[in-house]
Swiss-Prot record:
Signal peptide: none annotated. The keyword Transcription does not apply. Its EC number is 1.3.1.78. Keywords: Amino-acid biosynthesis, Aromatic amino acid biosynthesis, Chloroplast, NADP, Oxidoreductase, Plastid, Repeat, Transit peptide, Tyrosine biosynthesis. It catalyses: L-arogenate + NADP(+) = L-tyrosine + CO2 + NADPH. InterPro entries: 6-PGluconate_DH-like_C_sf (IPR008927), NAD(P)-bd_dom_sf (IPR036291), P5C_Rdtase_cat_N (IPR028939), PDH_N (IPR046826), Prephen_DH (IPR003099), TYRAAT1/2 (IPR045011). The keyword Transcription does not apply. It is found in: Plastid, Chloroplast. Induction: Strongly inhibited by tyrosine. This is Arogenate dehydrogenase 1, chloroplastic.
Length: 640
């Protein structure tokens, strides 16, 4: 394989040394313990007497307008100001727009809502004409980092102003897919609220806005928020940006896990890099999390490469180099970097029988399953339900499991093969398939028996079958793109990929192959006919990347937090699904898919590039701050 050039960041910066460059955000006030509030009761029908709030939004970009739409719908009075001209959007929403901050502040809003970016908030606070506002005005921020915001607000606001630090854990994109704010988390910390009834009531009235929309209200200290957010939010954004850099696109054989990653990449890439950089710089915990991701990915690569090294050494010493299966390098074409879809290879499988009906006598098959573990039992259950006769064999004893499913179990392969099954399904692992195939007593079977595999890689079993099976045996390579977990509620609309590698020309053999495929069509599977090479091309992008991300996250030992975002919940679900698979499966996807190595290296290069972006910008910012704080003489030296 051609050597891949990996560009390292041109900075001599370690994670440890970088920590000294991040802001030190020591807090002068004690942090509250984490507490998740009960839902605040919705106001009763007589609560309309409560006057609406006069809310000024500073920063009327996408997010400010997003919040304004709901605030207006609830009857509150809104003013807005932004550096850019958003007067047209304000008029459309029914918001009074001001180009001059002094004019806005002289309207004496009850609440000032800061909807600025993380990077610009300090400059905004420095320019606000606080003297134009009423004393004790409530200031609210909605930043994704909270210790930083709290520290700035305490530093710049007059002492008689109230402070409420909040983080709506959602935005326009997540609300659109969720159809509203219901069930989405709203995190807040009452940093400084005066004891007078009016000020307490005003704060509660503001929080009530989000309660009315069905948000899950979570009260916690800003310190706890940032600790949890470094995992849930920063990891989600890091993985989303990595996937976006890989330029993955939908394929004809998407799994549910891969579709979730595509959605994540689409959502995250809609955010600016400034937001991601702000999460990195202004959350004290993010640098440690980035280092953990780095170490986890290196550990995963080392685990794969060390196993590969061991296999090659073993084969070399035993003089069995013939067992190393070399495939054409499909990665030479530059188009592979964009995972271009070849839709012309996808053939729609036509099936006209009634879904899930039992088969007639003429279509009933006698099927032998070799390898009766979880996946073999999973398939056998449906085949028996449809009226097929199922026989099974495995190295381990599954007699009891077979009896429960109505499957005839054999402890001797010769005995099973002498029953002359029409179809043999190999449900073995990728790594054991060759050894199992070489041990089969083919002479006990009828000539022209149909052999089927269900492996997650396809060129490898295709070549193995053609090399090992007698020439008068039929070959059908398949990949059910689901398993016991993803298919536990039925197979409807789940992809079943197949390639009729070698099917005899007579009607009986064609009919037998179609009867086998009908098993999956009857259950509502999306039948996709494509070549083994095309399958492996797409699977390297979809399946291997999905398993790589799942394995990477598993090494981070992620846990649910009180402030999980929808994106983070997607990652947790992915870990749950992939962690149930053995490492042998993942290693098999890597070893026997000729495109997997290229994808692993692309992931590595993308991660290095992302770190370069972060550290390069951090280094530039640090140099700029040094230049600003230097004497004129030093500044001249730095800039010359």
């Amino acid at each position: 394989m051609a050597e891949t050039l990996i560009t390292k960041p041109p900075l001599s910066l370690s994670f440890t040394s970088l920590s000294s460059m991040l802001p030190s955000l020591s807090l002068s006030t004690a942090n509250r313990h984490l507490s998740v509030t009960d839902t605040i009761p919705l106001p009763n029908s007589n609560s309309n007497a409560t006057p609406p709030l006069r809310i000024a939004i500073i920063g009327f970009g996408n997010y400010g307008q997003f919040l304004a739409e709901t605030l207006i719908s609830q009857g509150h009075i809104l003013f807005a100001h932004s550096r850019s001209d958003h007067s047209s959007a304000a008029r459309r929403l029914g918001v009074s727009y001001f180009t001059d901050l002094h004019d806005l502040c002289e309207r004496h809003p009850d609440v000032v809502l800061l909807c600025t970016s993380i990077l610009s908030i300090e400059n905004i606070l420095k320019t606000l004409p606080f003297q134009r506002l009423r004393r004790n005005t409530l200031f609210v921020d909605v930043l994704s980092v909270k210790e930083f915001a709290k520290t700035l607000l305490l530093q710049y606001l007059p002492e008689d102003f109230d402070i409420l630090c909040t983080h709506p854990m959602f935005g326009p994109q997540s609300v659109s897919s969720n159809h509203g704010w219901r069930g989405l988390r709203f995190v807040y910390d009452k940093v400084r609220i005066g004891e007078e009834r009016l000020r307490v009531s005003r704060c509660e009235s503001f929080l009530e806005i989000f309660v009315r929309e069905g948000c899950e209200m979570v009260e916690m200290s800003v310190t706890d928020h940032d600790k949890f957010a470094a995992e849930s939010q920063f990891i989600t954004h890091t993985l989303g940006r990595l996937l976006g850099m890989l330029k993955l696109i939908s394929t004809p054989i998407n799994t549910k896990g891969y579709e979730a990653l595509l959605d994540l990449a689409e959502n995250i890439c809609g955010d600016s890099f400034d937001l991601y950089y702000g999460l990195f710089v202004y959350n004290n915990n993010s640098l440690e999390v980035l280092e953990r991701i780095d170490l986890a990915f290196e550990a995963l690569r080392k685990e794969l490469f060390s196993r590969l090294h061991g296999v090659v050494r073993k084969q070399s010493f035993e003089g069995e180099a013939k067992k190393v299966h070399v495939f054409p390098n499909c990665g030479e074409n530059d188009a592979s970097l964009d995972m271009m879809r070849s839709e012309d290879v996808v053939v729609k499988y036509e099936y006209n029988s009634q879904v899930s009906g039992s088969v007639n006598d003429g279509s009933r098959l006698k099927i032998g399953i070799v390898g009766f573990g979880n996946f073999g039992q999973f398939l056998g259950k449906t085949m028996v339900k449809q009226g097929h006769t199922v026989l099974a064999y495995s190295r381990s004893d599954y007699t009891d499991e077979a009896a429960k499913l109505g499957v005839s179990y054999f402890s001797d392969l010769d005995d099973l093969f002498e029953e002359h099954p029409e179809v043999i399904i190999l449900c073995t692992s990728i790594l054991s398939t060759e050894k199992v195939l070489e041990s089969l007593p083919f002479q006990r079977l009828k000539r022209s028996t149909l052999f089927v595999d269900v492996l997650s890689v396809k060129e490898f079993p295709r070549n193995l079958f053609l090399q090992t099976l007698p020439q008068d045996f039929d070959i059908l390579c398949t990949h059910p793109m689901f398993g016991p977990e993803s298919g536990k509620n039925g197979w409807n609309n789940l992809a079943f990929v197949f390639d009729k590698v070698r099917i005899g020309m007579d009607d009986r053999r064609k009919s037998r192959c179609n009867s086998f495929l009908d098993i999956f069509a009857r259950e509502g599977c999306r039948m996709v006919e494509m070549s083994c090479a095309e399958h492996d091309w797409h699977a390297a992008g979809s399946q291997f990347i999905t398993h790589t991300v799942g394995r990477l996250l598993e090494k981070l030992s992620l846990e649910s937090t009180p402030i999980d975002t929808k994106g983070y919940e997607t990652l947790l679900k992915l870990v749950e699904n992939t962690a149930g698979d053995s490492f042998d499966l993942y290693y098999g996807l890597f070893l026997y898919n000729p495109n997997a190595m290229e994808q692993l290296e692309r992931f590595h290069v993308a991660f290095e590039s992302l770190k370069t972006q972060l550290f390069g910008r951090l280094h530039s910012q640090h140099s700029h701050e040094l230049a600003k704080s230097s004497s004129p003489k030093t500044t001249k030296l730095l800039t010359s």
